[in-house]
Amino acid sequence: AIRWLRAHSSKYGINKKKIAVWGASAGGHLVGMLGTTNGVKDFEGTVGKFLEYSSKVQAIINYYGPSAFLQMDDHPSKINHRSPSSPESKLLGKPIDQVPDLSKQASPFHHVKVNLPPFIHFHGTKDPLVPYHQSLILHEAMLKQKNESCLITVRGGSHSMPPDFTDQFVIPFLDFHFYSLGSQIHSQEIKQKR
């Protein structure tokens, strides 16, 4: 998809040097993988017509995506993530604990290294499906490698984010990184609005 966008950038008015990806839940996992495997040849693949174009992205917006499959059951959740019927096990084709190497390969947390694009993570502390810990450990791993990462913690928040977060955080995050406008968004905790 990223290569396709670059190949058609002039037709759609896309700046090839400023591509951000945004995903929630399973989509958050996918954008986390895109960001942490940015430029890793083994993850480039050979599918599609536009292999001459880069699949690198320049910013990641992660809404409560899984980041370390094998640690998901270490924290409260309504899902038994090690079950054969869990979303993570279905993705891998087997229960995650039966394929630990594949589980790690499919987890953004295990691909964090230096020189990654900036991330902003959003996660509720009461998320019943993807434990808050998933964004926290990815954020901390990013910082440990001197990458830019911001975590917006929603105290009492569930598996969703308020629509006003787009204007409050996402647009300013992109403005700062892509256009040097405004100020940098910093990690913070917000109470869930009732």
Question: Could you describe each region identified by the protein language model?
Answer:
Residues K16-K18, S55-A59, L116-P118, Q145-C150:
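Loop/turn elements at helix/coil->beta-strand transitions in domains of secreted/extracellular proteins
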Residues T36-D42, G48, Q71-H111, P117:
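Mobile cap/lid helix-loop segments that gate and shape the active-site cleft of serine hydrolases
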Residues N115, I120-H123, D127:
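Short beta-strand/loop motif that positions the catalytic acidic residue
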Residues V154-M161:
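Histidine-bearing beta->alpha loop at or near hydrolase active sites
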Residues F165-R194:
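Catalytic active-site module of serine/aspartate enzymes centered on a nucleophile-bearing elbow/loop
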